[in-house]
Amino acid sequence: MEASRRFPEAEALSPEQAAHYLRYVKEAKEATKNGDLEEAFKLFNLAKDIFPNEKVLSRIQKIQEALEELAEQGDDEFTDVCNSGLLLYRELHNQLFEHQKEGIAFLYSLYRDGRKGGILADDMGLGKTVQIIAFLSGMFDASLVNHVLLIMPTNLINTWVKEFIKWTPGMRVKTFHGPSKDERTRNLNRIQQRNGVIITTYQMLINNWQQLSSFRGQEFVWDYVILDEAHKIKTSSTKSAICARAIPASNRLLLTGTPIQNNLQELWSLFDFACQGSLLGTLKTFKMEYENPITRAREKDATPGEKALGFKISENLMAIIKPYFLRRTKEDVQKKKSSNPEARLNEKNPDVDAICEMPSLSRKNDLIIWIRLVPLQEEIYRKFVSLDHIKELLMETRSPLAELGVLKKLCDHPRLLSARACCLLNLGTFSAQDGNEGEDSPDVDHIDQVTDDTLMEESGKMIFLMDLLKRLRDEGHQTLVFSQSRQILNIIERLLKNRHFKTLRIDGTVTHLLEREKRINLFQQNKDYSVFLLTTQVGGVGLTLTAATRVVIFDPSWNPATDAQAVDRVYRIGQKENVVVYRLITCGTVEEKIYRRQVFKDSLIRQTTGEKKNPFRYFSKQELRELFTIEDLQNSVTQLQLQSLHAAQRKSDIKLDEHIAYLQSLGIAGISDHDLMYTCDLSVKEELDVVEESHYIQQRVQKAQFLVEFESQNKEFLMEQQRTRNEGAWLREPVFPSSTKKKCPKLNKPQPQPSPLLSTHHTQEEDISSKMASVVIDDLPKEGEKQDLSSIKVNVTTLQDGKGTGSADSIATLPKGFGSVEELCTNSSLGMEKSFATKNEAVQKETLQEGPKQEALQEDPLESFNYVLSKSTKADIGPNLDQLKDDEILRHCNPWPIISITNESQNAESNVSIIEIADDLSASHSALQDAQASEAKLEEEPSASSPQYACDFNLFLEDSADNRQNFSSQSLEHVEKENSLCGSAPNSRAGFVHSKTCLSWEFSEKDDEPEEVVVKAKIRSKARRIVSDGEDEDDSFKDTSSINPFNTSLFQFSSVKQFDASTPKNDISPPGRFFSSQIPSSVNKSMNSRRSLASRRSLINMVLDHVEDMEERLDDSSEAKGPEDYPEEGVEESSGEASKYTEEDPSGETLSSENKSSWLMTSKPSALAQETSLGAPEPLSGEQLVGSPQDKAAEATNDYETLVKRGKELKECGKIQEALNCLVKALDIKSADPEVMLLTLSLYKQLNNN
């Protein structure tokens, strides 16, 4: 008898009493797992009445303590964040700063009020990461979200993962990143099947946007898509922006410390993405009605009327974006704290609150060091600007941008020029191999031959920098040195090493994340490293280097935000020392002009984001445009102007005054204070007086607001159509152009935007007429002359027995008065594919004949190209597409696209269908019937799906005046083509066909999946051992921490920030979340009354997740793994790769790893419930796992007790794998026994260690 075997002293019990005792104990354990502590308490007491023993009494005591603690805590476990309505776990809430709580309340207000998205634009270093994590914690706890996609630069992944572990250790967080395609797919499927957060990078998004936007052959809509460093999509025609738009999402959040970096069009791009086109109208209207007046008003020579108009338009823009936009600077936070020091005294626990008080930031002095060029630099600089033959010698291409590049290099160091140019300037020798040397070569041979003294004497900046760094090292400061050029860092590194400096360096060549982390930690912990060399683009984002107290910006950037990002690596929360920044700028050169433009852009940022109502105007339009004029190279006009304005405002102390006196002794031209810019606002009285007198200004503001609102409403009407064309683009096959694109010869910047929005002209009639199509109006150089190029893009997708997928992208010219797009969609169907193909062939011939005539007539000649679906095309275009970079603009130069459906493409489709059908002939009859039923169901609804699958018409009229507009669907196709050609497209035709084939199996399996057992109790550290089955079980459970791939800190409860709530709430929707699929819904309902996702449940969820990961890794590495164990990507990459697996599968079903949501499935013989649901034949004996006890398993398939007993015996004999097989089968029969589950966990752990 079981009871007597467990407890020898229980032999006095009758069989009936023993059975009752075991039943009560079992039911009490299940109640504990389900979080029903009252029921568990009652059942354990009943068991105690039958047979009192120490084990039962200890459990009763633990549950009683937990119930008492819960009664004391009540609903205070959660706290309403700033009375917003979002409840946040109290321990987490108490660790947040006040401004962070306000940020979380803002994020929740977006969701609560039905806004589709927003921008959190807090200054760098104020904790945007923590705000997002805490917000997601509250949303998951309240079951308001299930699936979140988080996109960020590569170097921030480790930071985010660590923050998630630190703040919400129970949240399910996976990464979609790294070299292992199988691991990426498994992590993504785990989040999509259940719930949680998936973290990926912008480059992964570009390569795998199709995979991220789909699941099992269907569109997958994320609850939230969150972009960190969202200024990556500031230009909406880049591949990052296009692919981000293709991800279906209910809500979108953007995080950036620099929402505007160059112009207001970047702000429009961010809001257009975040609000899905429903806020700021079209780019053309925004540029005309908002950007141009605001920009003109910021110039020093603007008229009073222009200043007043810009002021009111700026106010109106701020009012529009205010509900969707939140930005706080460090200065704002500090001022608010100092003005209200008693704000937190009314909290219940002031001791805890004191921990969360915003620390005082140290003082920052941002100095501009104006440096004179040395005679050699000045001579070359003057000759280059004034003499054409010098330009010809030093430049390979004649363009203003290239000229500016050469001038910038001359300001920094003449040796930055090519080896050939240095030879012509008598700066060194020139050899043949130097001619092929790259501009950014890390090892510059012609510099290696130059002495240190010569390198220093040739650059005024280098002379100053060496003296400065020596002084800072002697004073004990650690310094960051930023430059945009790796060659400059090479020179600085060489000079410093020869002077015995200990230096570290991070630039674009340090690609491994672990190596970056190692160098950062070394600098933070070791004071001996006095200088850290970084490139501005790589080292200026996402790093925390608060060990340094001095920052040197060697060369200014065109973008003020770039330099500001670099400074904020040091000046952020956690910095306790005063910070001094040195920006090195040469007098009278192009660098001074760049700095002027920085100041001007900064004024736009401050006014538009609400930091300043009317910032000071420093420069006129003419002063900003004079880039190539030579001014006084010994003194700076800008420095003299700023000194006269701000000299008396500098915040200083004795040490800083002494240091500035030392800097003046180094022969510099002067010092000005960058941090004092815009410290004094201009009076708005002048502007307000003009506004009151001018009825015109009020009308302009009303007109601008009306146009934006009107266009935004029209765009909402188009969103569904655009979504089916753009965000559902993963359903289409790639279309390969037959010829490469050529740049338009007369367009400087043909940069179309991938916007799902209308691009309208100025008249309301055109706005209204464009409701049914995306319209972009092309204004040719002469006003009034328009060239309308209309095209219809037809996508036809057919389901051939649910296997093959035929697609034909046909382009035809839309005749005038042909009717609306909606009518065309209504009249079309899947059966019209042949007629469309015939018409397109005729159109193709006519277009080819008329092409030369039309090109001759065009004032703005644009190239045309053809789309042909053929194998030869794929091979021809491949090398050209690989040259596209992430920031390249994807253009469509006024195309007359033509698509012909060739025999090759049709044959390819039919071959795929034949292969898939042939593979399925060996499947069981019932499985085929299920598949056919689902196919028939899909084919019965052609009218509902035809706009998305069959025919999708889009009318495009190009607008060259609005170069930023784009056709996102075509751009996505270009990204898709590029990815598919280079082998990185995640979903091939075979992959989608396979997913459709297995669709019926996947849905039928959901109800049979075992589920996780978790503790649903609001219990702190005192009651954390409720679910223990005794000391042995506790030990076995604790041992599972060794398989945690994140961090062992999940089980270190001493840290105050490792909270136990904020886990993804496990709902009961399929697929199941618990081990037992038989947990009644009423139990789960009662659990949500006042319970939090407390520590034990959170940690158990994490452990079970890690066990599943381990199991899948074991399955993947098993020599005898079944066909369902290999990842789905084997099908995606090539059909030939899966052949060796399909040979082992008698039923012909290739089951993907995403279907193994149960942690119990290790082999086909053990998946009895799945075989039953599929109706598949019993597996052959040859498919049994190596060494499995076939005789015992065959006899005891449905005998739970026998399987458990056999498993224990095998475990005692040391046969881990065989014991695991038996226990897995037992759990398939009855999965609610915690003793067997914990024993299985222990076996998995032992097997993994072995």
From Swiss-Prot:
Outcome following mutation: Y21A: Decreased affinity for BEND3, and abolishes BEND3-mediated stimulation of ATPase activity
Domain Helicase ATP-binding: 109-277
All copies of domain Helicase C-terminal, residue ranges: 464-620
Function, in words: DNA helicase that acts as a tension sensor that associates with catenated DNA which is stretched under tension until it is resolved during anaphase. Functions as ATP-dependent DNA translocase. Can promote Holliday junction branch migration (in vitro).
Ranges of compositional bias, category Acidic residues: 1125-1135
Compositional bias annotation for Basic and acidic residues: 1115-1124
Location of the protein in the cell: Chromosome, Centromere; Chromosome, Centromere, Kinetochore; Chromosome
Keywords: ATP-binding, Cell cycle, Cell division, Centromere, Chromosome, DNA-binding, Helicase, Hydrolase, Kinetochore, Mitosis, Nucleotide-binding, Phosphoprotein, Repeat, TPR repeat
Chain positions covered by the region annotation Disordered: 735-768, 926-946, 1061-1092, 1110-1199
Designated name of the protein: DNA excision repair protein ERCC-6-like
Family: Belongs to the SNF2/RAD54 helicase family.
Residues that bear Phosphoserine: 14, 755, 774, 807, 810, 820, 969, 971, 995, 1004, 1028, 1069, 1098, 1118, 1181, 1188
Complexes and interactors: Interacts with PLK1, which phosphorylates it. Both proteins are mutually dependent on each other for correct subcellular localization. Interacts (via N-terminal TPR repeat) with BEND3 (via BEN domains 1 and 3); the interaction is direct.
Disulphide bridges, residue numbers: none
Effect of T1063A: Induces a decrease in phosphorylation
CDD domains: DEXHc_ERCC6L, SF2_C_SNF
Residues binding ATP, per UniProt: D122, D123, M124, G125, L126, G127, K128, T129
A GO BP entry: cell division
Ranges: TPR repeats: 21-54, 1200-1233
Claim: Cell division is one of the keywords in the record: yes
Gene: ERCC6L
EC identifiers of the protein: 3.6.4.12
Effect of L13A: Decreased affinity for BEND3, and abolishes BEND3-mediated stimulation of ATPase activity
Outcome, altering K128A: Abolishes ATPase activity
Motif residue range(s): DEAH box: 228-231
Biased composition (Polar residues): 1075-1087, 1149-1173
